[in-house]
Swiss-Prot record:
Keyword Hydrolase: no
Subunit structure: Homodimer.
Keywords linked to the UniProt accession: 4Fe-4S, ATP-binding, Cytoplasm, Iron, Iron-sulfur, Magnesium, Metal-binding, Nucleotide-binding, RNA-binding, Transferase, tRNA processing, tRNA-binding
Functional pathway: tRNA modification
Protein name, UniProt field: tRNA-cytidine(32) 2-sulfurtransferase
Primary localization: cytoplasm
Chain's gene name: ttcA
Described purpose of this protein according to its UniProt entry: Catalyzes the ATP-dependent 2-thiolation of cytidine in position 32 of tRNA, to form 2-thiocytidine (s(2)C32). The sulfur atoms are provided by the cysteine/cysteine desulfurase (IscS) system.
């Protein structure tokens, strides 16, 4: 076997391993939050970035082996930004045989007209885009709207709200839309951004740049992102532990009196969540909670959507 053949075999092995991990992560998120049900029509929001391309491929992959029937329709919003390559997504979606709809709305012109030069346009643009996507979901008869936010996005939002908003609030894997008419799901909620980056690079998706609008980047989010990436490098497993903490909330040991009835704690009240034992010095595990070395990925047999339970 030549050196090139050995290299290609190794690359294919690594890609298969990475795809299995992403499939497992997505399948577990779908099962944990009952994201997809029998007969669902999922509107997959496709921006042209690595996250949405990966989400679409993994959902299509799971669709083939799922114990339930559901359909997918990809939707892209062409906001008429200068330089937007209109041909890329239709060509890609035609090639892979996915049902899709391109929605053309000049939100770029609206934003430029309303927002002074030099100011960030993201907030207004996001509101306009959300409204259009909700309308499109209704027109297409979609029962769920799938967005491509991943685990790192969720953690970044948690820290943004803590640092700048004074709230212990993240980005939920599943929610009711603000118009009360649509269920929004985030199938990549358990997926690491670095896995998505590697997968997208290996798959050579036709990525569309996200800065065509010319808006200033969200500097606060970038600071948080850099902080988390630095932690991940210096303290492997810390990111997994923090995400695990979002899934293990103890209201009685926070300070939100609207969330827990502190006022009615009196003599004779039950001990809740260990009482003050929670503050005793504990032996911490050698490895952070929720963390496993990447080499152990093949140990899990969950590679299909067979973790899903129909409710």
């Amino acid at each position: 076997m030549s050196e090139n053949q050995q290299t290609n075999q190794k690359e294919q092995y690594n890609l298969n391993k990475l795809q299995k991990r992403l499939r497992r992560n997505v399948g577990e998120a779908i099962a944990d939050f009952n994201m997809i049900e029998e007969g669902d029509r999922i509107m997959v929001c496709l921006s042209g970035g690595k996250d949405s391309f990966t989400m679409l491929e993994i959902l299509r992959n799971l669709q083939q082996s799922a114990p339930i029937n559901f359909s997918l329709v990809a939707v892209n919003l062409d906001q008429k930004q200068p330089g937007f390559p209109e041909h890329i997504l239709p060509q890609y979606l035609d090639n892979i045989g996915v049902e899709y709809k391109i929605v053309e709305e000049n939100t770029y012109g609206i934003v430029k007209d309303k927002i002074p030069e030099g100011k960030t346009t993201c907030s207004l643009c996001s509101r306009l885009r959300r409204g259009i996507l909700y309308r499109t979901a209704t027109e297409l008869g979609a029962t769920k709207i799938a967005l491509g936010h991943h685990r790192d996005d969720i953690l970044q939002t948690l820290f943004l709200n803590m640092f700048y908003g004074g709230k212990l609030k993240g980005m939920p894997p599943k929610l009711m839309s603000d118009d009360g008419k649509h269920i929004v799901i985030r199938p990549l909620a358990y997926c690491r951004e670095k896995d998505i980056e590697r997968f997208a690079e290996a798959r050579q998706y036709p990525i569309i740049p996200c800065n065509l609008c010319g808006s200033q980047p969200n500097l606060q989010r970038q600071v948080i992102k850099d902080m988390l990436r630095d932690w991940d490098k210096r303290h492997p497993g810390r990111i997994e532990t923090m995400f695990s903490a979002m899934q293990n909330v103890v209201p009685s040991h926070l300070a939100d009196h609207a969330l827990f009835d502190f006022k009615n704690i009196r003599h004779g009240s039950d001990v809740v969540d260990g009482g003050d034992l929670a503050f005793d010095r504990e032996e911490l595990p050698l490895q952070p909670a929720g963390w496993q070395p990447e080499e152990d990925d093949d140990a899990s047999p969950i590679t299909r959507l067979d973790v899903l339970e129909i409710k």
